[in-house]
A protein has these predicted regions:
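Short loop/turn motifs that connect adjacent beta-strands in outer-membrane beta-barrel proteins
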Residues: 1-12, 24-25, 54, 58-62, ...
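Residues that define the transmembrane beta-barrel architecture of outer-membrane proteins
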Residues: 8, 42-48, 96-101, 178-182, ...
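Transmembrane beta-barrel strands of outer-membrane/channel proteins
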Residues: 16-20, 64-68, 136-140, 197-201, ...
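Residue-level signature of outer-membrane beta-barrel architecture
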Residues: 18, 54-56, 66, 107-109, ...
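Surface-exposed coil loops of outer-membrane beta-barrel proteins
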Residues: 78-95, 99-102, 112-220, 224, ...
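Outer-membrane beta-barrel "beta-signal"
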Residues: 101-114, 339, 408-420
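Signature for the C-terminal beta-barrel architecture of outer-membrane proteins
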Residues: 163-286, 291-296, 300-307, 314, ...
Length: 420
C-alpha cells in the first residue's frame, strides 16, 4: 500500500492475510476426537505482522517482528496431516494478544570483494552482499525462513496454502505451536552453491507453546546444501538437500502400543516418563524454470517414523510435485497461479498406533483403514490495487487423516492479502 525506502538503514512494513475456507458434508463411517468433522464447516483465519529492522553498520542488522494471529480453523486444525491452511493457530486456547514473532541479529562476514545485488526484505535489509560470504543469525525466527525455501511453493501470502505444499511435511522442524523457535543459523554462500546449518530449541510437548531452554538435552540440528544449477540447458534451477535430527521428550509408537496391549487400554503416545529420544529425516527440494514465467517444483521427505510427530505435522513420508506461473505470461505481471499434487504417508508403527485408537497432536479417528493422504491444490492470485491481492483456490483431499473410511473432502478457499 505504501512505498518502501531503498538504500535505507531502516525497514518498516506490514501485512495482513485473511483465509476463508469451507467444506460441505462428506462421507465418514466414523469419527474420533481428532477427526476432521464430516459436517458442513466454514472458518476464517487471520495473521497480521508488523516488520521492523535497522542496519547497525555495513555488516550487521537487527530485525524485530510483531504478530497477531486469530480467527478459526476447520475442526480447530485437527484431522488432516496436510492441513488446508498454514496460517491457522493450531491451539485455539492461545491468547489472541500481539506477540513477538521474530527478533534476531543478522551478521555478514565478507569472504570476497565482489558484490551481488540483494533484494531487500524483512529478513535482510542489505541492498548488496559479498558474493562469497558467511551469514550468522541469532535469536527468534522460523526455520522455514531460511531452510526448504522454494520460489513457487513456500509463501501462504501469494502461493499455496496447504501445510505439505509450502513446507516438507516430513520435516518435523523445531518450533512452538506458532511456528517459531530460538537458535542460531550459519549460512555459507558462494557463486552457485551454499551450505547452511541451524541449532534450535524444541518445545516441551508436542505442538507446545513453551520451548525447552536446555540445549544440552533438548535440541534440533538442521543441515541444507543448495546447488543453484538447472537440469535444462540455459534454464535456471535449484536443488536443496535437507537433513535434520531432533532430540526431545518424544514417545515411541511401538512402545506405547505394547504397553497398551499389556494393560488392555488405548495407546497414549504421551504416557511415558520424561526421556530423550531422537528423530531424524531428510528431504529434497527441487525447482526448475521451464520458461521465463513457468517453474516446476517438487519435494520429497522422509523421517524414521518410529518417534512421535512432535512439532510440525503427522507425516513420515511425503512427495509433492507442481508448477507455479507468473502472470507476466498473460500480461498480468503481478498475478500468480499454481497447481500441485501431494501424497503423504506414515510408517507402520504410526499406522498401528492410530488403528488401535491412539491420538496424536493432530490425528485420531478412533480407528484407521490406512491409505495415503492424497491432496490436489490449485489457486489464482489476482493483484487488484497497490498492495491488495485476492486469491480463490480449491483443495481436494482423498483419505483425510490417512483413513480410507473417511472422505473425500473438497475445500474451497478464498484469500485476501494486504501489504503496507
Amino acid at each position: 500500500m505504501l512505498p518502501h525506502f531503498k538504500n535505507s538503514r531502516f525497514w518498516l512494513s506490514g501485512q495482513t492475510n485473511f483465509v476463508f475456507q469451507t467444506h460441505p458434508d462428506f462421507p465418514a463411517l466414523y469419527s474420533g476426537p481428532h477427526s476432521l468433522s464430516p459436517d458442513y464447516e466454514k472458518a476464517t483465519s487471520r495473521v497480521m505482522t508488523f516488520y521492523t529492522g535497522v542496519r547497525l553498520n555495513n555488516s550487521t542488522e537487527l530485525l524485530v517482528d510483531l504478530e497477531e494471529a486469530g480467527g478459526a480453523a476447520l475442526s480447530t486444525g485437527l484431522g488432516l496431516a496436510g492441513n488446508t491452511d498454514l496460517d491457522i493457530v493450531r491451539n485455539p486456547l492461545l491468547s489472541k494478544n500481539v506477540y513477538l514473532g521474530r527478533a534476531m541479529i543478522h551478521k555478514v562476514f565478507a569472504l570476497s570483494k565482489d558484490k551481488i545485488e540483494n533484494q531487500r526484505s524483512f529478513l535482510s535489509l542489505f541492498d548488496e552482499l559479498p558474493r562469497r560470504r558467511l551469514e550468522l543469525r541469532f535469536g527468534k525466527f522460523s526455520l522455514p525462513d531460511f531452510f526448504d525455501v522454494n520460489s513457487v511453493g513456500s509463501d501462504t501470502h501469494f502461493q499455496f496454502l496447504n501445510w505439505t505444499t509450502d513446507n516438507n511435511g516430513a520435516w518435523d522442524y523445531a518450533a512452538d505451536t506458532r511456528g517459531y523457535t530460538v537458535g542460531l543459523t550459519a549460512d555459507f554462500e558462494d557463486r552457485n552453491w551454499g551450505f547452511r546449518f541451524a541449532e534450535a530449541l524444541m518445545p516441551e510437548v508436542a505442538n507446545g507453546i513453551n520451548l525447552v531452554y536446555r540445549p544440552w538435552q533438548v535440541h534440533a540440528e538442521n543441515y541444507e546444501y543448495e546447488l543453484r544449477r538447472g537440469i535444462l540447458p540455459k534454464k535456471a534451477g535449484v536443488v536443496r538437500l535437507l537433513a535434520y535430527t531432533n532430540s526431545a521428550n518424544m514417545g515411541i509408537y511401538r512402545d506405547q502400543i505394547i504397553e497398551a496391549e499389556d494393560a488392555g487400554t488405548t495407546p497414549d503416545i504421551t504416557n511415558h516418563p520424561w526421556h530423550i529420544t531422537r528423530k531424524y529425516g531428510f528431504g529434497v527440494n527441487f525447482e526448475q524454470n521451464l520458461t521465463h514465467n513457468l517453474t516446476a517444483f517438487a519435494r520429497f521427505g522422509w523421517d524414521n517414523g518410529k518417534t512421535e510427530s512432535f512439532a510440525y505435522t503427522e507425516v513420515d513420508q511425503t512427495f509433492a510435485e507442481g508448477v507455479g506461473a507468473n502472470g507476466a505470461w498473460w500480461h498480468r505481471k503481478q498475478d500468480r497461479a499454481g497447481i500441485v499434487f501431494i501424497s503423504n504417508a506414515i510408517k507402520k508403527d504410526h499406522q498401528n498406533y492410530l488403528a488401535d485408537g491412539g491420538i496424536g497432536f493432530l490425528l485420531g479417528d478412533g480407528g484407521l483403514n490406512y491409505g495415503c493422504e492424497n491432496i490436489f491444490e490449485t489457486y489464482y492470485t489476482v493483484h487488484t490495487w497497490r498492495g491488495i491481492y485476492l486469491a480463490p483456490g480449491v483443495q481436494h483431499i482423498n483419505n483425510p487423516g490417512y483413513n480410507r473410511d473417511r472422505g473425500p473432502v473438497v475445500v474451497p478457499t478464498f484469500r485476501a492479502h494486504i501489504e503496507f
